Amino acid sequence: MYTQHGKAYQVKARAVVMANGSWTTRHIVLDLDAARRDAYTQFHRSPCLIANIALRNWRFLYKMGISGGYWFEGMGVYGGIRTVPAFATEIKEIGPDSPVVLTLKVLFCRPGLPMEEQQTRGRAELISTPFREYERKIREQLTDMFAATGFDAKRDIAGIILNRWGHAYASPQPGFFFGKNGKPAFRDILRNSAFGRIAFANTDLSGDPSHVTAIEEGERAAGQLLDAPLTG
């Protein structure tokens, strides 16, 4: 189903590849068999906040001889200057006084809690926290780490954009790749064959979220449908 100009339309196809997120498939394919439905409950996704911070300069990092790094306290785990794309013969030079975008990655780990509970609580925090609170924490974190080398949040930050990813990263548990206790891996239940005219793809099934595995999984699923006889 989709809408266009305020009108709803229905699309029919002889075969379909379900390449959507693993947490949604069992709610879309309503007649999914028990084995596949159970398999889809075994895919776990962790939330992530990506903050893109527009900086008027990055001299405070340049003085330290770095363009990014990891840390272990406070908000976030990693920050780095984004690469500026260059096209054709264009030459891009970035000096310490150039305006740039600093990307900050924030994870929501709660060591000691079961994985699913960590993810559920993390998603709740990710979504419920207002922008102003994230902005305050970002300014405080950068000030705490870089004030000594000249960072001034009021002067240097031109803007902040937040991308809230509730199901950002696949989190494979023991048995995800090769099975457990003599039982097949849950991903293989979905990858090995189509469900009638429906095949399943998504980077979740590979355990490696990237554009490469997305293409490979899509090709595999399409091949299963093309190789199978379609009747009716």
Where are these regions (language model features)?
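Conserved flavin/dinucleotide-binding core of flavoenzymes
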Residues: 3-6, 54, 60-232
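Glycine-rich loop(s) and the adjacent beta-strand/alpha-helix scaffold that form part
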Residues: 3-73
